[in-house]
Amino acid sequence: MNHTVRIRVDFSAGGSIGPGKVALLEGIHRTGSLRQAAQELRMSYRRAWLLVDEINRSFLTPATTATVGGAGGGGAALTPFGEELIRRFRRLERAIQSLSREALAPITAQVRSAPPAKARSTSSAQRRRLSRTASSGRAD
């Protein structure tokens, strides 16, 4: 049975980096555009801008640079630090996934191959009736 481990690094001084922010940085690297990266991730431009701003404020060195629009349009790019941030985060993900396979093998061996059937919920009226039946000592 397989499993996936998702990580997020929270820094003591504030800020964090996780798979969503790294995917956004990868999109910027691939497209050269914050707007296009946001569209690929089905994220609003405003949300993407706020995330990139948070990333850049979290570190001494910014992860991205932007050029102002004009006749040729604006754009966004990663700094060398932004590229390093992606590489190191993805390396950490692979290492943790590998370690978790061994550490969680006894647990994942116990996971059902299909999700369990949903338990039928008991309505409040059914619970009251069951309660009265139990307290009266008779069965329906």
Regions found by a protein language model. Name each.
Residues 88-106:
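Alpha-helical linker/hinge and terminal dimerization helices associated
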Residues 42-44:
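Central "turn" residue of the DNA-binding helix-turn-helix
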Residues 28-38:
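Short helix-boundary/capping micro-motifs
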Residues 51:
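Residues within the DNA-recognition helix of helix-turn-helix
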Residues 57-62:
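Residue cluster at the C-terminal edge of the helix-turn-helix DNA-binding motif
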Residues 66-92:
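Basic, amphipathic "hinge/linker" alpha-helix immediately C-terminal to the N-terminal HTH DNA-binding motif
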Residues 102-140:
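C-terminal regulatory/oligomerization modules of transcriptional regulators
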Residues 1-13:
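Short, Lys/Arg-enriched N-terminal segment that forms or immediately precedes the first helix
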